[in-house]
Design a protein with these regions (language model features):
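Binuclear metal-dependent hydrolase catalytic cores
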Residues: 1-162, 171, 228-246
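Catalytic metal-binding/acid-base residues of hydrolase active sites
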Residues: 44, 66, 166, 187, ...
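Binuclear metal-ion centers of metallo-dependent hydrolases, dominated by the metallo-beta-lactamase
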Residues: 169-246
Length: 246
């Protein structure tokens, strides 16, 4: 949803605090030697790319098919126009079908003037990406997200990125224990059928014992400063532009 909402509603968030201005969730993985991997194409993607001066996108991983994860996809076209190279997209079967149905022009060449700009690849459980002497391993795991599944991503067995979740599958608990970083959905205080609330996020923080936790996907209900005061020392609210080093 972002903060403020399109109607200007800040909810409980103090508009004087810059960390309360939130775009929809996307994450950028920067690998040395200028490789950029994007997780999700939020509707605010153009704004995010310009703000952080991103000049290339090499690969995109999708967590699921919802609009707030996919509807910035058209902004990837600019990088094709610049480099004349299709961008590799990775998505599960459900998300792939949604993307091909709703954004077919991205994946099919209709004319010389409108070539396919993206190449769709089926998401595997584990992918290793090499960039000269640097490499990153991305493990993809399903989590519950209301009536559908979402995909979370674990980078080099150190960082988990889970933007949308209503619960974990118990069989995968072992992958989330003792991570360096645990980036987890936390919509608001009350129960929600498709997202974690604060209580549930902190329940799993206590169970998995990461070194540091970042709460993301925060609604206008959650003011940055108020929320931060409520949290344990190793848990912080996310904010736009937050950078972590692995």
């Amino acid at each position: 949803m972002g903060v403020p909402r399109p109607d200007g509603f800040f909810g409980n968030c103090d508009p004087k605090n810059k960390k309360n201005y939130r775009t929809r969730c996307s994450a950028l993985i920067k690998i040395r030697n200028n490789m950029n991997i994007l997780i999700d194409t939020a509707p605010d993607l153009r704004q995010q790319l310009l703000r952080h001066n991103i000049k290339n996108i090499d690969k995109v991983f999708y967590s699921h098919m919802h609009a707030d994860q996919t509807h910035g996809i058209n902004d990837l076209r600019s990088f094709y126009l610049k480099d004349k190279k299709q961008i590799n997209i990775f998505a599960d079967i459900t998300t792939s079908k949604y993307l091909k149905k709703n954004f077919s022009y991205c994946f099919n060449s209709f004319s010389k003037e409108y070539p396919a700009t993206l190449k769709l690849n089926l998401l595997k459980k584990k992918i290793t990406i090499n960039n000269n002497s640097n490499k990153i391993t991305i493990r993809s795991l399903k989590v519950k997200h209301g009536k559908v599944d979402s995909t979370c991503f674990i980078l080099n067995n150190k960082l988990a990125y889970i933007s949308d979740i209503s619960d974990f599958y118990k069989k995968d608990f072992k992958f989330f224990k003792n991570l360096d970083y645990f980036i987890i959905d936390c919509l608001w205080y009350e129960f929600h059928p498709s997202h974690f609330n604060l209580e549930k996020s902190l329940y799993y923080v206590k169970m998995f014992k990461p070194k540091k936790t970042i709460l993301t996907n925060l609604s206008p209900v959650l003011d940055y400063k108020v929320l931060k005061k409520m949290l344990p020392k190793n848990v912080i609210p996310a904010h736009d532009g937050l950078t972590l080093n692995l």
